[in-house]
Curated annotation (Swiss-Prot):
This protein is involved in the repair of mismatches in DNA. It is required for dam-dependent methyl-directed DNA mismatch repair. May act as a 'molecular matchmaker', a protein that promotes the formation of a stable complex between two or more DNA-binding proteins in an ATP-dependent manner without itself being part of a final effector complex. HAMAP family: DNA_mis_repair (MF_00149). The lineage of its organism: Bacteria, Bacillati, Bacillota, Clostridia, Thermoanaerobacterales. Keywords: DNA damage, DNA repair. This is DNA mismatch repair protein MutL. GO terms for biological process: mismatch repair. Belongs to the DNA mismatch repair MutL/HexB family. It comes from Caldanaerobacter subterraneus subsp. tengcongensis (strain DSM 15242 / JCM 11007 / NBRC 100824 / MB4). CDD domains: HATPase_MutL-MLH-PMS-like, MutL_Trans.
Length: 590
């Protein structure tokens, strides 16, 4: 008896459906993408209990005639491509022709559709991949698809679904991504019979962000764009002080398709390096338009992954666009003190809470910015950087310190500065750290070093001598000149000029340990990390008393820094507070 045999069509369809339909959110994604490809201007998504028992997607797209409606449930039946050549010029979201067939194979589907100017529409009832009913019906132009009892015939798949609230969260994520990629379409999202949001469809990405994420995110947006042959980049990002513990607020789109791509993530990380802490992530809404021939979306049925033919070009374009937005924006956070609006019995007036957790960061909108940019136009609603031009970064990034008065220092750590109706508090250590970091980075080929009076002997762990030998050039660029001294020791002849001998020896050991314990794919990135550490060790510390001349020198150096807002590790250098806020706290005004 033969051991190998062909599977029947029903079983094949169920197996294939497993790649396309992972959960209710997958169904919503496929149906909405079909609606978008149909030219819809209004799309409604409704779910009950996470979409497990019920999903409905309604659109006003082109609709289908009876023949096309039936063909749509056949595997690999599509209107998007006709030959393998078309795979290299894909402009639609769907193209495999598997969506409806896969959905119908594991659920109960009711489809109603009608083309424009047709008297009647078509209604199909499909269960487990079989068409049970085909009738004429009266309906509006467009298509509506109801999906019931997901995985009703594959109980093994159904039991692996999460609880309804979790599945609903996945659906919400999918609808959110689709809204952001299609600002010209009005989306209505209804969950458990409650409207969650409605987008206007007016074509504004900013408006979609406002409706989905609220004023806090919208008010913190910065924007820049880049355009070259066969490539356009638009980047909306939150200012550095509004950041998150994961990448969930990062949305990447290539030719209108939501994608995940390591090159894009790396470009964002590099652009925000030293602007946010290493374990925090900014919100980013990134849109790329590129010739379809230079990308490959036919990697996986989910179509979430994309490959670029020239990763380096994409990386540099995205990095440059976001970095431009950061350079041309006011990134000073404003401190806001929340008030306790609950008055205890017999107590008059409001109590102001001064505990640390009540400090929150808010966008600075006052015109009296301490760093005033010359020859840069700003808009009231959003900080927009100009398109990339041939002028140098230094010309576009000129900052000057004007009309300020140094009030004094607080706790021998913070410098207080007054300008107009705003006062600023500067962390002297973070400010000096930023200044030293940028100075050292500018000396990229060789950090300035000095000869030591007496040789410094450094004892290393077994095996570290091989690492030191391999990375001699990197250590030299960091300011170290050394010789081997016995089996597991080296003698330092020159050390970075900004460090004292004890710190220089300690840092050398730390660098070797990090080279041993981590696989650094980018030596440039590693060098920048070590320079940041070097700057931190050499900078003035908290409780170091500065003279008035030293404070002014700190400001003179800070005002010409490329990024005067954060230290190399992403901590804020400067925060602000307004006179109005202070007067409200003292009840001088309401």
């Amino acid at each position: 008896m033969n051991k190998i045999h062909l599977l029947d069509e029903k079983t094949v369809n169920k197996i294939a459906a497993g790649e396309v339909v992972e959960r209710p959110a997958s169904i919503v994604k496929e149906l909405v993408e079909n609606s978008i490809d149909a030219g819809s201007k209004n799309i409604t998504v409704e779910i009950l209990e996470g979409g497990i028992p019920y999903i409905k997607v309604t659109d006003d797209g082109c609709g289908m005639n009876e023949i096309d409606a039936v063909l749509a449930f056949e595997r690999h039946a599509t209107s998007k491509i006709r030959s393998d050549e078309d795979l290299f010029n894909i402009t639609t979201l769907g193209f495999r022709g598997e969506a409806l067939a896969s959905i119908a194979a594991v659920s109960k589907v009711v489809l109603q559709t009608k083309e424009e100017n047709e008297t009647f529409g078509t209604r199909l009832v499909v269960e487990g991949g079989k068409i049970l009913e085909k009738t004429r019906c009266g309906c509006q132009k467009g298509t509506s698809v109801e999906v019931k009892d997901v995985f009703f015939n594959t109980p093994a798949r159904r039991k692996f679904l999460k609880r309804p609230s979790t599945e609903a969260m996945y659906v919400t994520e999918v609808v959110t991504r689709l809204c952001l990629s299609n600002p010209g379409i009005s989306f209505k999202y209804v969950k458990d019979k409650k409207v969650q949001f409605i987008t206007s469809g007016n074509g504004s990405i900013e408006d979609v962000i406002l409706r989905l994420f609220g004023k806090e995110v919208h008010s913190a947006l910065i924007f820049s764009e880049f355009e070259a042959e066969d490539l356009k980049v638009k980047a909306f990002a939150t200012k550095n002080f509004l950041n998150y513990s994961n990448r969930n607020m990062q949305f990447f789109y290539v030719n209108g398709r939501y994608v995940k791509n390591k090159t894009l993530s790396a470009a964002v990380d590099e652009a925000f390096k030293t602007y946010v802490p290493s374990d925090r992530y900014p919100g980013v809404f990134l849109y790329l338009e590129i010739n379809p021939r230079f990308i490959d979306v036919n990697i996986h049925p989910s179509k979430l992954e994309v490959k670029f033919s020239d990763d380096r070009r994409i990386f540099e374009s995205v990095y440059r666009t976001i970095r431009e937005a950061l350079r041309e924006s006011n990134l000073i956070p404003e401190v806001k003190l929340e008030k306790d609006l609950k008055n205890e019995e017999g107590q008059i007036g409001e109590q102001v809470k001064l505990s640390l957790p009540l400090f929150e960061v808010k966008e600075k909108t006052d015109d009296g910015a301490i760093f005033v940019r010359e020859e840069v136009k700003t808009e009231e609603k959003i900080d927009k950087a100009p398109k990339h031009e041939s002028s140098s970064d230094s010309e576009r990034n000129v900052k000057r310190l004007s009309d300020i008065r140094i009030v004094g220092t607080l706790f021998s750590t913070y410098v207080i500065v007054e300008k107009g109706d705003v006062f600023y508090i500067i962390d002297q250590h973070a400010a000096h750290e930023r200044i030293l970091y940028e100075k050292l980075v500018s000396q990229y080929e060789r950090v300035q070093s000095r000869q030591v009076t007496f040789p410094i002997v450094v004892e290393l762990q077994p095996g570290d001598m091989e690492i030191v030998g391999q990375e001699r050039e990197l250590l030299y660029k960091l300011g170290y000149v050394f010789e081997e001294f016995g089996n597991n020791s080296v003698v330092l002849r020159e050390v970075p000029v900004i460090l004292g001998q004890p710190e220089a020896k300690k840092l050398f050991v730390e660098i070797v340990e990090r080279l041993r314990d981590k696989d650094f794919s980018s030596k440039v990135s590693f060098k920048e990390e070590e320079i940041a550490t070097m700057a931190c060790k050499a900078a003035v510390k908290a409780m170091d008393t500065l003279s008035e001349n030293e404070i002014y020198k700190l400001f003179e150096d800070l005002k010409i820094a490329e990024n005067p807002y954060t230290c190399p590790h992403g901590r804020p250098v400067i925060i602000s507070m307004t006179k109005t806020q202070l007067e409200k706290m003292f009840k001088r005004i309401k």
